Amino acid sequence: MHEFVTICIMAAALGMDAFSVALGMGMLKLSGKQIFRIGLTIGLFHVAMPLAGMAVGKWLSGHFDVIATYIGGGLLLVIGVQMALNAFSDHEAEGLKPAGWGLLLFAVGVSLDSFSAGLSFGILGTEMFVTVGMIGAMSMVMSWIGLIVGSHFQKFLGAYGELLGGLVLIGFGLKIMLPL
């Protein structure tokens, strides 16, 4: 029972991280179909990354944690800068979009922290399928909530909403890269 509570708390924490970042991404003008795909992709990556972390194991954790931090923060920073720069542009952004490779890069950036969580769970020997299922489901649902809430804010804020979303992602990227 204690292990299940630990898994639930970790899944909620990783889900809140996904919610926060999705809130910023939700400031883009997204369709319901895009919101569904983004949340599903983030959920799938929150299954794949802990699995990868569990598979890699303890020997790589000391080296990859630092690299994962900078990669994840850097990806969020790039997406945030691109959103902020294109907030008041008359044409559609040519940079990273929440589709195709842009969506994959976004999902990787959001889910890199779950790789480290997977390392921890692998070391502790937790039940793999329950763990990654809980993390994936929680992250997917929290992403959908963040995207929907962000899209409602965007309706009121217009182009300023996309700028705000970009600044949120920049802030999270910097927070990840430069922990205080």
From Swiss-Prot:
GO terms for cellular component: plasma membrane. Keywords: Cell membrane, Ion transport, Manganese, Membrane, Transmembrane, Transmembrane helix, Transport. The chain crosses the membrane at residues 4-24, 40-60, 64-84, 103-123, 129-149, 156-176. It is found in: Cell membrane. GO terms for molecular function: manganese ion transmembrane transporter activity. InterPro entries: Mntp/YtaF (IPR003810), Put_MntP (IPR022929). The keyword Cytoplasm does not apply. It is a multi-pass membrane protein. It comes from the Bacteria. PANTHER family: MANGANESE EFFLUX PUMP MNTP-RELATED (PTHR35529:SF1). Probably functions as a manganese efflux pump. Belongs to the MntP (TC 9.B.29) family. HAMAP family: MntP_pump. This is Putative manganese efflux pump MntP. It comes from Shouchella clausii (strain KSM-K16). The gene is mntP.
